[in-house]
Curated annotation (Swiss-Prot):
Changing residue 147 to N: Does not strongly affect N-terminal glutamine amidohydrolase activity. It comes from Mus musculus (Mouse). Belongs to the NTAQ1 family. The gene is Ntaq1. GO terms for molecular function: protein-N-terminal asparagine amidohydrolase activity; protein-N-terminal glutamine amidohydrolase activity. It comes from the Eukaryota. Changing residue 83 to A: Loss of N-terminal glutamine amidohydrolase activity. This is Protein N-terminal glutamine amidohydrolase. One of its GO terms (biological process) is protein modification process.
Length: 209
């Protein structure tokens, strides 16, 4: 079945970045990992940046199940408060997801990622249904800021070791991560979608129809 869909065209697809192992990666800092990936694309393939988006996955309860994650590679999902991936929509209409925390291929054809990592809302309780804030990569690079305070416990200790490079900040902000995690369309940057809306907007099958 997979061979009949986007995977069949995958050999013609040119990834926007090097291998997974060559990407900047820090566990539990997915928002920065994707920011760094956007930065790489801007530096090496400026024109491709226009085809890329940072995608925040969360909901009002900040409880979103995602399958096929390295943190739980077996059949069950990981319940994240939020997760961030890169979406590339090529000029040929192929959509690929770059998830540095998945055990699926890197990059992964959009429709395969939806089927295997996100599955369907029909089988998920209402409070766990995912929403997606889709932000253009150039806007993400320009506006995102994090002082990493969300990764410290009440005693000020790191829950996970922070990246060695300096905190990402802008001229206007040192911390606006919550504006990206929020699924309130009136807040922050980009557009907010439900899972069906996200699939309809970016599925490679939609482009082929």
């Amino acid at each position: 079945m997979e061979g009949d869909g986007p995977a069949a065209t995958a050999p013609q697809y040119q990834p926007v970045c090097p291998t997974r192992d060559a990407c900047v990666y820090n566990s539990c800092y997915c928002e920065e990992n994707i920011w760094k990936l956007c930065e790489y694309i801007k530096t090496h393939n400026q024109y491709l940046l226009e085809e890329c988006y940072a995608v925040f996955i969360s909901n009002e309860k900040k409880m979103v199940p995602i399958w096929k994650q390295q943190a739980r590679p077996e059949n069950g999902p990981v319940i994240w408060d939020y997760h961030v991936v890169l979406l590339h929509v090529s000029r040929e209409g192929q959509s690929f997801i770059y998830d540095l925390d998945t055990i699926l291929p890197f990059p992964c054809p959009f429709d395969i990622y939806i089927e295997d990592a996100l599955k369907s809302d029909d089988d998920i309780h209402l409070q766990f249904r995912r929403k997606f804030r889709v932000v253009r990569a150039d806007s993400y690079l320009k506006h995102f800021a994090s002082d990493r305070s969300h990764m410290k416990d009440s005693s000020g200790n790191w829950r996970e070791p922070p990246p060695e490079y300096p905190c990402i900040e802008t001229g206007d902000s040192k911390m606006n991560l919550n504006d990206f995690i929020s699924m309130d369309p009136a807040v922050g940057w980009g557009a907010v979608y439900t899972l069906p809306e996200f699939v309809h907007r970016f599925s490679s099958k939609t482009y082929q129809a």
